[in-house]
Amino acid sequence: MRTFIIKANKAHTKADFKLKDLPGTSGRIDLLCRVLNSAFLLSHGFRKNVRVWLSLYGPPNPPKAIRFEGQGMKPKTLNPDELSTAKLIIKALKVGENLREPSKEIQVLPGIYVSNLTFEDIIRRTLKGATLYYLHEEGRPIERVNFSQNVAFVLGDHEGLTPEDEAFLSGIAEKVSIGRKSYLASHVVAYVNIFLDSITPPP
């Protein structure tokens, strides 16, 4: 199983943005849509062995967590275009509007869940079943890492993780790198998937 956890510090936690202007009104929900597509979609297929957590910390009601489970999702739920993916996020945010309990998850659609879990909650839950890595330019080259069958990767949005987030990850997540340059989050996820596909047996 492969898990991708992306912390989006400005992504809106309410469906109050415009689909026609995702970059300008949503806190970069468009970036999260591209991450989801890179995580799950193949040219003629769908990755069932992937889980994605979107950890949203933008206005007005942070945090919100949206979990996408490849094993539970119907392949046709996720399409290549950003707008239809953004509509899934909007649906999840609307379903989660009245959530009060911090640990309760509500199913939005098969394989898609929304909650008020914090970034730290997600990390702690993930650590119970996977080895955790922090994708960072200054990390160990990914080619030199021996990966287990259950792996999880943490990455930030266009602004990266906060110093507090990095301090929390210190000691529990090894830094790994796909290169010394800063790449788009969706490209990083695509690269990691392709690299893991080449391992025998792949996670």
Swiss-Prot record:
Keywords: Cytoplasm, Methyltransferase, S-adenosyl-L-methionine, Transferase, tRNA processing. GO terms for cellular component: cytoplasm. It is found in: Cytoplasm. InterPro entries: Alpha/beta_knot_MTases (IPR029028), TrmY (IPR007158), tRNA_m1G_MTases_N (IPR029026). Specifically catalyzes the N1-methylation of pseudouridine at position 54 (Psi54) in tRNAs. NCBIfam families: PRK02135.1. This is tRNA (pseudouridine(54)-N(1))-methyltransferase. It comes from Thermococcus onnurineus (strain NA1).
